[in-house]
Amino acid sequence: MNLRVKHWIYGIFCLLVAIIAIGPELHVASNAHPKKAVVESQVKEKPTQEKEIDNSESHMRTPIDWHKSSETVPYPDLNKVKDFWIKVDLKNNRTYLYDGSKVIYTMYSTGGIYKKDPKTGKLKSVTPTGTFYAQQERGDSFFNQSLKEGANYYVSWKNHGEYLFHSVPTKADGKYNEQEAAKLGKTQGSHGCIRLSVPDAQWMEKNLPVGTKIEIVG
């Protein structure tokens, strides 16, 4: 066998060795890229999901300000709402405006204080619970001499003027009771009515249709 043939055979042998050595790496690389793509896709999708969660509560005004509306977006146009009703959550200090099963606006609120029920021994709010309906009695202001307390922008939902939605309370001089107003959306404090921020109460007085269903829980 001459020298040229030996070199030719040696070259073929080296080429085969190289192909055998590189083959597994090519296989691993081809399998690695799809997995990497899936991981990268999951990483990219995760911030989108977190953003959607954040947006669900992004309209609530923080910190709570009883001088302003509870949300930073406009109040709902009730002319476009098909099934309007209200739910008041006494324990969580929130009033929810609904269109069917969908919450369309949330208001910070303060309901009645909790007292021990002599029959059950359990704490119970002085605000009645159950299903009620908005009544025609409403106005820009009132003052209760016996309680030495008043409020602005009220609308009745029980006993025709006894239980109301209204603003945070006012004192005898007509000024807002800032100590009581600071409880809005944080804790209970009323004598049975539902307190709202000043703009929220004003919207209720002007826009709440007579006969609107109001469910109060807590």
Regions found by a protein language model. Give the residues of each.
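N-terminal, intrinsically disordered, polar/charged segments of Gram-positive cell-envelope systems
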Residues: P24-D83
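Gly/Pro-biased beta-strand-loop elements
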Residues: T62-G174
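N-terminal secretory signal peptides that target proteins for export/translocation
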Residues: M1-L3
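Exported/periplasmic cell-wall-interacting domains
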Residues: V5-V17, L26-H33, S146-G218
